[in-house]
A protein has these predicted regions:
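Active-site helix of classical SDR
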Residues: 109, 145
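Conserved NAD(P)H cofactor-binding loop of Rossmann-fold oxidoreductase domains
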Residues: 77-82
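Active-site-adjacent segment of SDR/Rossmann-fold oxidoreductases
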Residues: 134, 155-166
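Residue(s) in the substrate-gating loop at a strand-loop-helix junction
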Residues: 129
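Substrate-binding pocket helix/loop in short-chain dehydrogenase/reductase
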Residues: 85-86, 93-95
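Conserved glycine-rich cofactor-binding loop
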Residues: 11-12
Length: 267
């Protein structure tokens, strides 16, 4: 196809699966990792050009962008998962989460948009989460970052689509990529939320262990990229069509009780 794609967080999970899918379809793929030299040879995707990028570091973003050249597709996938009661989340941890999950991807998007407009073609995919559409307890900071990404993408579609540049969001539901092992958790010693939080995390881990594969999400990302007019939102996994239908039909208070019950919480 001759098009160049950038996939952030390409060393594992959704990013790795997306990079592999795009290489198979003939794209030139630049995959990012904070430490690409640490990716074992047998964990690398053949055909992917790995480059260093730390989305929390403005200097790293600037250095990465300076060496890019033309980019036709950007998949903003890199991010961190975080959990904890709002009252006990360290401010510096929340700030870092927003730098990694929101501000870094937006800076990268701003860097590639002018070239896409000039060539009258571009695709930007924000890898979000269904938690942005269905907020969960103890996931306020993470859900807020994913809602912010979607908000940027939905609004910017109006600005960029006249130039042939389409922004879209892919929202996976529960996905089994090992992210639960890397999730950062914050809970004060003696917290009044301890029992509630412990039950919630156990239910969440169980659901994610039964979740869809990264390949399933990658297939949806590729479908969005290759659509003539990508939709604003693609949701995949966790019975997405049913869940979004239920959200339209049920009052918010009923939906809150349903989410609480599914995660072992009494409300």
């Amino acid at each position: 196809m001759g098009r160049t794609a950038v996939v952030t967080g390409a060393s594992s999970g959704i990013g790795k699966a997306t990079a592999a899918a795009l290489v198979t379809r003939g794209y030139r793929v630049i995959g990012t990792s904070r430490k690409p030299e640490g990716i074992e040879p047998d964990a690398q995707v053949p055909g992917v050009e790995y480059r260093a990028l730390d989305l929390t570091d403005n200097a790293s973003i600037a250095a990465f962008v300076a060496g890019l050249g033309e980019v036709d597709l950007l998949v903003n996938n890199a991010g961190e998962s975080q959990a904890g009661p709002l009252a006990e989340l360290p401010t510096d941890a929340v700030e870092r989460l927003f730098r990694l999950n929101v501000l870094g991807p937006i800076a990268l998007t701003q860097a590639v948009l002018p070239g896409m407009r000039e060539r009258r073609y571009g695709r930007v995919v924000m890898v979000g989460s269904m938690i942005a559409s269905f907020p969960m307890p103890y996931r306020s900071s993470y859900g807020a970052t994913k809602a912010a990404l979607k908000g940027f993408a939905v609004a910017a579609r109006f600005e960029e689509s006249p130039f042939g540049v389409w922004l879209t969001t892919v929202e996976p539901g529960q996905i089994n990529t090992g992210l639960r092992e890397r999730r950062t958790k914050y809970l004060d010693e003696g917290s009044p939320h301890t029992a509630d939080f412990t039950r919630f995390i156990a239910k969440l881990d169980e659901a994610q262990g039964k979740g869809i594969t990264a390949d399933k999400v990658a297939d949806t990302i590729v479908r969005a990229i290759e659509a003539d007019r990508p939709q604003p939102l693609y949701a995949v996994g966790s019975n997405a069509p049913i869940m979004f239908g239920v959200r339209r039909l049920l009052p918010r208070t009923v939906l809150e009780r349903l989410i609480a019950r599914v995660h072992g919480l009494s409300r």
